[in-house]
């Protein structure tokens, strides 16, 4: 996946699922499944329900994404 092809959106974490997956509600109202990016996992950043996050999505599968940033 090339960096130019990603869609970046903001959302709120609704629920924590097994295997480091999260249910995220985007600003436009859609709910997607998102996993944690490698840098967040390496730095042990905790993501809890209610956190505001930035999600990268591929234009090929708009139901899944990658959490790339957690706002403070």
From Swiss-Prot:
CDD domains: S1_IF1. It comes from the Bacteria. GO terms for cellular component: cytosol. GO terms for molecular function: ribosome binding; rRNA binding; translation initiation factor activity. InterPro entries: NA-bd_OB-fold, RNA-binding_domain_S1_IF1, S1_domain, TIF_IF1. It is found in: Cytoplasm. Gene3D superfamilies: Nucleic acid-binding proteins (2.40.50.140). Its main location: cytoplasm. Transmembrane segments: none annotated. Residues 1-72 form the S1-like domain. Component of the 30S ribosomal translation pre-initiation complex which assembles on the 30S ribosome in the order IF-2 and IF-3, IF-1 and N-formylmethionyl-tRNA(fMet); mRNA recruitment can occur at any time during PIC assembly. One of the essential components for the initiation of protein synthesis. Stabilizes the binding of IF-2 and IF-3 on the 30S subunit to which N-formylmethionyl-tRNA(fMet) subsequently binds. Helps modulate mRNA selection, yielding the 30S pre-initiation complex (PIC). Upon addition of the 50S ribosomal subunit IF-1, IF-2 and IF-3 are released leaving the mature 70S translation initiation complex. Belongs to the IF-1 family. This is Translation initiation factor IF-1. It comes from Staphylococcus epidermidis (strain ATCC 35984 / DSM 28319 / BCRC 17069 / CCUG 31568 / BM 3577 / RP62A).
